[in-house]
């Protein structure tokens, strides 16, 4: 919750006028949280961890011990693509995957998105929906989908659609081709239960929601205002 809450609330939530406080909306400096987010304990640490998972999974792929190992590898690649996008969107060019050792080369955002979209397509195509995933549960391994490999494919294809749209700002032709390629699968998130999400919990853990703090004041949205104005014949 530390940086996830504060980076969101002090920066983006403030700028979007979802909360009455300073931050980006007033030019206030909360760079300490940004520094934490991009540090080895958080953003870069997350990427290092998933890179290690992909590395181990790739090494074991030639001689897997369990039927779900290939799918775990592909799920890790999909998650890594998302983590890379978060870092790149927030901080700009970052080193490519598996390059956080020694002197690294920072890639452009366009190159990063090319890698992400290609990685998502390849990983989704290698998931085996018939593999026994019964040992993979939300409590231990898969907080999103409880081991449902088919939903990871939908997640990957949906991310491809999202990232293709982001590419449109710099290369419309490439973005159009990437979007249409993902859309042609006709296999992406369409229902609420397919969304990659975790149940928010109380307390101070990694699964706590950033919008659920008792001290976190919420500004009323226009949508809610429109719903309640005139409700029951009473003016708002």
Q: Where are these predicted regions, by residue range?
A:
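Short acidic-aromatic linear motifs embedded in glycine-rich loops, typified by GG[WY][YF]DAGD(H)
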Residues: 1-114, 132, 188-236
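Acidic interhelical loop/turn segments
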Residues: 63-67, 125-152
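TPR/TPR-like alpha-solenoid repeats
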Residues: 83, 90, 123, 163-164, ...
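Short, well-structured active-site flanking segments
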Residues: 88-98, 125, 171-181
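Bacterial peptidoglycan biogenesis and beta-lactam-recognition machinery
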Residues: 165-199
């Amino acid at each position: 919750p530390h940086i996830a809450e504060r980076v969101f609330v002090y920066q983006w939530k403030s700028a979007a006028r979802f909360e009455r406080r300073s931050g980006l909306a007033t030019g206030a400096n909360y760079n300490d949280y940004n520094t934490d987010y991009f540090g080895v304990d958080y953003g870069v640490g997350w990427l290092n961890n998933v890179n290690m998972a992909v590395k181990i999974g790739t090494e074991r792929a030639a001689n897997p011990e369990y039927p779900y190992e290939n799918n775990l590898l592909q799920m890790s690649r999909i998650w890594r693509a998302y983590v890379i996008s978060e870092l790149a969107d927030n901080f700009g060019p970052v080193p490519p995957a598996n390059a956080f050792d020694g002197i690294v080369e920072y890639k452009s955002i366009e190159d990063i998105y090319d890698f992400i979209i290609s990685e998502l397509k390849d990983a989704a195509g290698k998931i085996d929906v018939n593999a026994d995933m019964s040992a993979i549960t939300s409590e231990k391994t898969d907080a999103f989908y409880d081991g449902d490999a088919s939903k990871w494919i939908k997640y990957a294809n949906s991310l491809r659609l999202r990232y293709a749209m982001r590419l449109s700002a710099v290369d419309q032709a490439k973005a159009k081709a990437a979007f249409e390629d993902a859309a042609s699968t006709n296999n992406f998130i369409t229902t609420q239960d397919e969304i990659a999400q975790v149940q928010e919990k109380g307390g101070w853990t990694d699964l706590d929601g950033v919008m659920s703090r008792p001290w976190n004041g919420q500004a009323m949205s226009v949508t809610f205002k429109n719903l309640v104005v005139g409700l029951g014949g009473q003016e708002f």
